[in-house]
Amino acid sequence: MTETQNTSRRPGALIAMSGGVDSSVAAWLMQRDGFDCTGVTMRLTRNEAVNTEGLHTCCSERDIEDAAEVAYAMDIPYEVLDFTADFQEKIIDKFIRVYEAGGTPNPCIDCNRYMKFDHLLRWAEAHGLDHVVTGHYARVEQDEATGRWLLKKGLDENKDQSYVLYNLTQEQLAHVRLPLGSLHKSEVRAIAEQQHFVNARKHDSQDICFVPDGDYARFMEDFTGKHYPAGDFLDVGGRKVGTHSGAVRYTIGQRKGLGLAMGAPVYVCAKDMQANTVTVGPESELFDTIVYANEVNWIAIPELKGPLRVTARTRYHQTEQPATVYPAGPDSFRLEFDQPQRAPTPGQAVVLYQGDVVLGGGTITQVAKG
């Protein structure tokens, strides 16, 4: 290819189309800006394995139809890629392992990490496409001083999705485009209406795609063929106060559905998976100051060399809280919040910020009162 031919080539973009309004508008924005777009939807589950009828999930057969219709309206190539085997291995199997070990996993973060920004980037490269584009509400920018790629919050605070993207690496960020990061949801829907997209008024997906009804314990039993046995509810003093229906069915901080009459509200405070016990207590028992994390990914800095003031989230929609982060060995850190936080939970992500910039994050391994 000559230099003239190379510079005249329009950049190519793989659009990860979920069938929702956000990724559809992301595709339209990239096409408007001069990119040669190819729409791709990942098939992650089989119809017979997951019943999504009437539920707001993603990547269902209905979503594939919607994505294909938008791609047709835009006159762009469109493909469905079958990732069901890898999705089961990397997402579903891990989801079950973490729950069975007593944690609370976040499969949407793992899906971004292993599927969207790994498999799709490799597919894009193999097909000569320069970028992978998604409909996430976050921003990617390059720091002129350091040359590092930065992940920033989306301007729409109510839709910001930077928390679920903290695992993006420098190599990935260099090829990722997030055109909705500077828009508000209302603007996105307005564009979809103007373009007469079939999904302009479609509800956002709200649940885990392979557990759309939210009953993850039933899904796990159906998927594995196991039965999770009943066990003892204990109070914080170790005394039996009732019988639960299987420790995997409960999450830290849960109040509803316990079936206990103890004269005052009680919450799930701890689980012992080997003993199959669930400890309940007053809400005050849920608050912890120290969080330990591993599987760390740094974005704004190459590594953590010493204590650093940050703000942090231990849940998706939590307002960031002030804290200090300390190195704690290879691929790990210790985070000390200024004030105790409610129910930080092993298995969930803890994401660190400085202003609107994502510093990095990791997976919570344990918590402590401090």
Task: For every predicted segment, state its role.
Residues 1-166, 177, 186-187:
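ATP-dependent adenylation/nucleotidyltransferase module used to activate substrates
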Residues 21, 133-370:
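AMP-forming adenylation/ATP pyrophosphatase catalytic core
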